[in-house]
Amino acid sequence: MTKQPEDWLDDVPGDDIEDEDDEIIWVSKSEIKRDAEELKRLGAEIVDLGKNALDKIPLDADLRAAIELAQRIKMEGRRRQLQLIGKMLRQRDVEPIRQALDKLKNRHNQQVVLFHKLENLRDRLIEQGDDAIAEVLNLWPDADRQQLRTLIRNAKKEKEGNKPPKSARQIFQYLRELAENEG
């Protein structure tokens, strides 16, 4: 028995199958280049980190070795090594690396903000005295009121006598210790 023309159409694969997973996503060449350039910048950012910060980022051994080599190389060789690091990053999941890098940056920003707040509080302590001490005691109940009063009195004398602000620095250090012990 021979197949009729209508029967052979049933054997053609893919006519009746509609699978969305097999859908091809078209990406422009420019977008691929932008992504590659972004990963190269990410690699350069990682290369610029110090050893302690680099330890906090999840890197495999090959990528870590390439980054350490790039840190030692100068000029044109460094550019080529950054290209290699970008290529290596394209083959890996970079989301954990980005998250760790953002965490490092954010920690630094939080520390800067905290220092500015402590500096402002120190300046208010020197200017306002007991009112600002009450604010400090509300923030940190275990703060030593007498030590703060002594440091403030000395800071005011140093300011009036145009002397170096040794006591003002001590107030800042004391406030920083209180903030660190709290969190």
UniProtKB/Swiss-Prot annotation:
Domain of life of the source: Bacteria
GO biological process, one term: assembly of large subunit precursor of preribosome
Subcellular location: Cytoplasm
A Pfam family the protein falls into: DarP
Gene3D superfamilies membership: PSPTO4464-like domains
Protein name: Dual-action ribosomal maturation protein DarP
Biological role stated in the UniProt entry: Member of a network of 50S ribosomal subunit biogenesis factors which assembles along the 30S-50S interface, preventing incorrect 23S rRNA structures from forming. Promotes peptidyl transferase center (PTC) maturation.
One cellular component (GO) term of this entry: cytosol
GO molecular function, one term: ribosome binding
UniProt keyword annotations, A-Z: Cytoplasm, Ribosome biogenesis, RNA-binding, rRNA-binding
CDD domains for the chain: YjgA-like (cd16331)
Gene transcribed to yield this protein: darP
InterPro entries recorded: DarP, DarP_sf
Family affiliation: Belongs to the DarP family.
